[in-house]
A protein has these predicted regions:
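Hydrophobic alpha-helical bundle cores within soluble ligand-binding/oligomerization subdomains
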Residues: 1-245
Length: 245
């Protein structure tokens, strides 16, 4: 990586000049009703789209006033508590929720089995991808590692640039399939090169769920308990709401 110290003096001068020449009067934000970040000045989330894919209720009306409340999370009109209760005891809560968010309805048994089979088929990375992309440039910032991996995967995608729905669904399924591998392998590379830990690359098992494969690939002995897998499965389900609508 470039030696930033070599240009530190000049960069400091450039920074001061940039700040001086690009200052914005704070009163203009209120004058033109410009949102700063994802919330307005009253703390309300900024409306960025109109969908029923997901919704978060963080406020309620009391005496004509909006006040914070115990949050409610909805996926396609389903309260997430109801989803978790309905999927309790099943191995594929995350997969069922992914089907719901992508396709708009809860899957039946056959549909869920078909969807999880698709995920298993796509849970593979290009030849030497782990070595050449993940291991050769490990990062302490896992989001940086994931971003780089996804951008590089685009070079292996024959459907890149296509906008038809089928191609985009295929791309979504492929990304859902490989993200656990990208995350775990990226962590192991960082742990080995930056922290002096051990390196081990475990392959995913097509018969296991996403949560189970995450734990299998993460652990040195590939072992985990049913409780750990269940808790992680629910955690993955809850974290699916991140800018989805």
């Amino acid at each position: 990586m470039s030696d930033y110290a070599a240009i530190e003096k000049e960069a400091r001068i450039f920074t001061e000049e940039c700040v001086t020449n690009n200052r914005i009067d704070p009163t203009l934000f209120a004058q033109y009703d410009i949102k700063r970040g994802l919330r307005d000045k009253n703390g309300k989330g900024v409306l960025a789209g109109i969908t029923n894919i997901s919704r978060i209720d963080a406020f309620e009306e009391r005496d004509g006033q909006k006040v914070p409340c115990e949050g409610k999370l909805w996926y396609r009109g389903y309260n997430v508590y109801d989803l978790i209760r309905g999927l309790r005891g099943k191995r594929y809560a995350f997969e069922g929720a992914a089907y719901l968010l992508l396709l708009g309805d809860l899957p039946n048994k056959e549909q869920l089995e078909s969807f999880t089979a698709c995920l298993a088929k796509c849970r593979d990375l290009p030849t030497n991808f782990v070595r050449d992309v993940i291991m050769k440039a490990p990062s302490h910032d896992l989001m940086n590692s994931l971003t780089r991996s996804v951008l590089t995967l685009a070079n292996y995608d024959d459907g890149i640039g296509k906008t038809d729905l089928q191609t985009q669904l295929e791309q979504c399924i492929k990304l859902i399939s490989v993200f656990p591998m990208l995350a775990v392998y990226g962590y192991h590379a960082y742990n080995y090169y930056e922290c002096g830990g051990s390196m081990y690359i475990h392959r995913p098992d097509p018969s296991l769920s996403t949560a189970e494969n995450l734990l299998k690939m993460l652990r040195p002995d590939q072992k985990y308990t049913d409780l750990e897998a269940h808790v992680l499965d629910i955690a993955l389900l809850l974290h699916m709401e991140h800018g989805g609508g």
